[in-house]
């Protein structure tokens, strides 16, 4: 869930009253939000960087509020305050209007060169806006929140905002070779080519995460005005020429991307949130966008649509008994203007452009439940009685866990995600040979892939507990994930059992004995006949030569055991010998 930081006093001013922390926490809960933390800029810096860095930072109280990931209209103070005001029935939800300019309409022309890079673009103008320092900060913060959420870190959509008074339309959205693009980027004092900028931003903590989006493309997207001034090179950086400030009065907003629907949603959210500060409140000036095929469209769309939902459906799904009129009132409090029509059981719900999250009747039902109050819904016994039972795989896991502990091993619970190094380099494998499922744009280097083996997690656990008395005997029974083209999701989970023994001697006999005990518990006899188990000498990059065996049950390989190679032990920052066992337990079901 995204977290929005707002100044407490500024929020209370927008709400028209003050609250105690407990009262505001309760209000957030009623509205489907969560007050995550009460802090200040000084406390945040002190916590993250130390007390020395916090000198001179603001002591203004900040509320950190967790917002549902699909409620883009609540990602800034303006939307949050507006939503709460409507919820408390202090104001009515505003009506957003698109207006045509008094003079010529601004145009954004898209050329065919953008087709293979970022083919879509939409635009709008906020006219006669009045910024304060706080409003300006909120405007920038909203763009960043949208970039991180619906825009998927700018991969799907990138937002550019510009001081229209410094530019001259019509505007052209095209794509050129990096060496042919030269401009002065935001907050820089000299011009650079696109190639030079990509090299400079590789060390920029903020922008380096977005370079991969276009870095390998032969052409880079760029937006010019009629005088050849560069507005932006999406999704990387805006030009410094059209930089907006607190004194900016007219803003040209462009959204480019690979997802047309999301680009329109992002544009609608920005203009609906900040048209509140325009001279003519909640009005947005239209922009004509000309596609490569010559077709013209006008944006923003600001669509209002109507949905029909039956009152008895809402009552049944939520578990309440409310009249259609009361349900319509509840929905109106959630910025969904509603009225009872037809036979008295039908409710017509108007979906505003700020509520792109409402795509189905169930979304309307959910909002009715939130407005009614989850704590007000009476608990009832189900009409049918069922007997719960464990999945066979989970039952087998629980039985084995108990006996592994009885055998003197301690259970560890490790992360399902790990680094590529952990499952490949450190085990002497190439990453391509692991069939690992990779995480797109991982947050940290420690969580790049889903684990294909439980062994690295246990070895890292031992490394973190090296000062504990020897021997260390650990086990884990959990899932690993590998690619599988035969599955609809392209991957499959397998339940593995892994155990390690770490001591001054390898203790292969301990691990071998544990295997025998596991097979005894599973009623699998030794030997090749009658589906028995056996081990055969094998080789593995993670194991010491001549000290590795493959485990077979009924002729099927289920795993390996052996003494780990010294290189593996060293790479996991260990100093003592170690033996391990890892098997797939699903064949025993």
UniProtKB/Swiss-Prot annotation:
- What sequence ranges are listed for the domain B5? 302-379
Enzyme Commission designation: 6.1.1.20
Catalytic activity annotation: tRNA(Phe) + L-phenylalanine + ATP = L-phenylalanyl-tRNA(Phe) + AMP + diphosphate + H(+)
The main location class comes to cytoplasm
The highest taxon in the source lineage is: Eukaryota
Which keywords are on file for this protein? Aminoacyl-tRNA synthetase, ATP-binding, Cytoplasm, Ligase, Magnesium, Metal-binding, Nucleotide-binding, Protein biosynthesis
Pfam families annotated for this entry?
B3_4 (PF03483), B5 (PF03484), PhetRS_B1 (PF18262), tRNA_synthFbeta (PF17759)
Q: Which residues cross the membrane?
A: none
GO BP terms in the entry: phenylalanyl-tRNA aminoacylation; protein heterotetramerization
| Disulfide bonds, paired cysteine numbers | none
Q: Which cofactor does it need?
A: Mg(2+)
- Specify which residues bind Mg(2+) according to the UniProt entry for this protein: 357, 363, 366-367
What EC class does the entry list?
ligase
InterPro entries tied to this protein = aa-tRNA-synth_II/BPL/LPL (IPR045864), B3/B4_tRNA-bd (IPR005146), DNA-bd_dom_put_sf (IPR009061), Phe-tRNA-ligase_IIc_bsu (IPR045060), Phe-tRNA-synth_IIc_bsu_arc_euk (IPR004531), Phe-tRNA_synthase-like_B3/B4 (IPR020825), PheRS_beta_core (IPR041616), PhetRS_B1 (IPR040659)
One Gene Ontology cellular component term attached to this UniProt record is: phenylalanine-tRNA ligase complex
Spell out the CDD domains in the cross-references. Answer: PheRS_beta_core
Q: In the record, which residues are listed under signal peptide?
A: none
Q: Does the keyword ATP-binding apply?
A: yes
Q: Does the keyword Cytoplasm apply?
A: yes
The GO terms this record gives for MF are: ATP binding; magnesium ion binding; phenylalanine-tRNA ligase activity; RNA binding
Q: Which NCBIfam families match?
A: pheT_arch (TIGR00471)
Can you tell me which family this protein belongs to? Belongs to the phenylalanyl-tRNA synthetase beta subunit family. Type 2 subfamily.
Subunit annotation: Heterotetramer; dimer of two heterodimers formed by FARSA and FARSB.
What protein name applies here?
Answer: Phenylalanine--tRNA ligase beta subunit
Say which species the protein is native to: Mus musculus (Mouse)
